[in-house]
């Protein structure tokens, strides 16, 4: 039996749902699950220091392979001693494969069996990313958890296209496993695709589970489908994945989606949402989203969220944060970003406690009622 560098330990199953409390052991420490992972695209979580991320309880962060491969280059990071030393982060790091960025950012991409040829979005130069190259770059980065190179088809692509795509993704996953130079200290996850088609998700899961990865990601969601469609895919996909390994739902950060994923047995999430909306002055609060830049808060001397105990809410008022944002002061973005990240990391801590107490469905109902979801704001 392979001794994987990434191990999942189940602590408790929730009585009334598929939710599970656990922990993931990595070469750079252990973190509890379910967990939300802040995204550090360019080897930094925008405006936040490693110390601040630790304060808020982030045991793992994500970095983007595509961006770091293009700039400053994976070989330079390897010379620095790997990503942990380069960015002074001594806890777990997960890297994606670069595939999603190739499909979403790059121009004029051409997908073949060998890989993807595309134009560098920074300078227009021609680039080629293959399963082997994606693994090689991540081996140089030295992340604790790596992703297989996959194609992320759009959710509403035709069935025949998605079928060919998942079959190619399975072949790419096998090639990536063979190219992996550091299986002793980097865990490589397989990525299940298949859009909204149950039989294709089943086929993709079967292919990848047979390859015995140390963990599995669910890709191809949060790409334009409805909340109900996402939940339906999770309902038939999560049970196909091994119970003794981590389950990671990629690119999901809306609070209700996090809770609904946990109910269905998901352990890990990542998303740029909390920092992206923070830069526009939008804050997640216990009572729903709050656009602190609005004129209504010019003389509001209460915290962004009176129920939040983060650094921002304990020390600064809505009026002050609004002033900073209106004056284009970076500190304002730091404060809103810290708050939003803390909100999601802390939400997962509350979810973990609800699993312990066997009252996750009640917790969900209370949260949704208070947050006030409706069609206009459900993405926040």
From Swiss-Prot:
Chain residues that bind Zn(2+): 308, 310, 313, 339
Biological processes, Gene Ontology terms: queuosine biosynthetic process; tRNA wobble guanine modification; tRNA-guanine transglycosylation
Membrane-spanning intervals of the chain: none
Signal peptide extent: none
Coiled coil: none
Cofactor binding note from Swiss-Prot or TrEMBL: Binds 1 zinc ion per subunit.
Classification via Gene3D superfamilies: Queuine tRNA-ribosyltransferase-like (3.20.20.105)
UniProt-listed Enzyme Commission number(s): 2.4.2.29
Keyword field: Glycosyltransferase, Metal-binding, Queuosine biosynthesis, Transferase, tRNA processing, Zinc
Span list, region RNA binding: 251-257, 275-279
Gene Ontology molecular function: metal ion binding; tRNA-guanosine(34) queuine transglycosylase activity
Protein task: Catalyzes the base-exchange of a guanine (G) residue with the queuine precursor 7-aminomethyl-7-deazaguanine (PreQ1) at position 34 (anticodon wobble position) in tRNAs with GU(N) anticodons (tRNA-Asp, -Asn, -His and -Tyr). Catalysis occurs through a double-displacement mechanism. The nucleophile active site attacks the C1' of nucleotide 34 to detach the guanine base from the RNA, forming a covalent enzyme-RNA intermediate. The proton acceptor active site deprotonates the incoming PreQ1, allowing a nucleophilic attack on the C1' of the ribose to form the product.
Protein name: Queuine tRNA-ribosyltransferase
């Amino acid at each position: 039996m392979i001794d994987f560098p990434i191990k999942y330990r189940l602590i408790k199953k929730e009585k009334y749902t598929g939710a599970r409390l656990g922990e993931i052991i990595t070469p750079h420490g252990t973190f509890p699950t379910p967990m939300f992972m802040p995204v550090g695209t360019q080897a930094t979580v925008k405006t936040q220091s490693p110390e601040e991320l630790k304060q808020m309880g982030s045991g793992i962060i994500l970095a983007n392979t595509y961006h770091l491969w293009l700039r400053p280059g994976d070989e330079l990071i390897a010379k620095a001693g790997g990503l942990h030393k380069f960015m002074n982060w001594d806890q777990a790091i997960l890297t994606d494969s670069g595939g999603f960025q190739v499909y979403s950012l790059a121009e004029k991409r051409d997908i073949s069996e060998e890989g993807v040829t595309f134009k560098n979005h920074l300078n227009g130069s021609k680039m080629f990313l293959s399963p082997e190259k994606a693994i090689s770059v991540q081996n140089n980065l030295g992340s604790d958890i790596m992703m297989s190179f996959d194609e992320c088809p759009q959710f509403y692509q035709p069935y025949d296209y998605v079928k060919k795509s998942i079959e190619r993704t399975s072949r790419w996953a096998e090639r990536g496993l063979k190219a992996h130079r550091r299986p002793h200290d980097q865990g490589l996850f397989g990525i299940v695709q298949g859009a909204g088609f149950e039989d294709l998700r089943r086929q993709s899961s079967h292919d990848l589970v047979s390859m015995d990865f140390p963990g599995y990601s669910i890709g191809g969601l949060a790409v334009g489908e409805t909340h109900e469609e996402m939940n339906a895919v999770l309902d038939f996909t999560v049970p196909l994945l091994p119970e003794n390994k981590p389950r990671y739902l990629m690119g999901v950060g809306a609070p209700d989606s996090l809770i609904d994923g946990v109910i269905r047995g998901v352990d890990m999430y990542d998303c740029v949402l909390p920092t992206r909306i923070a830069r526009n002055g939008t804050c997640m609060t216990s009572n729903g989203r709050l656009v602190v830049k609005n004129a209504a808060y010019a003389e509001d001397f209460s915290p962004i969220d009176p129920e939040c105990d983060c650094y921002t809410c304990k020390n600064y008022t809505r009026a002050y944060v609004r002033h900073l944002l209106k004056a284009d002061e970076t500190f304002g973005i730091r404060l809103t970003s810290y708050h939003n990240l803390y909100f999601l990391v802390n939400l997962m801590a509350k979810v973990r406690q609800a699993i312990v107490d066997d009252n996750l469905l009640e917790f969900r109902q209370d949260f949704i009622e208070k947050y006030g979801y409706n069609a206009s704001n459900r993405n926040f």
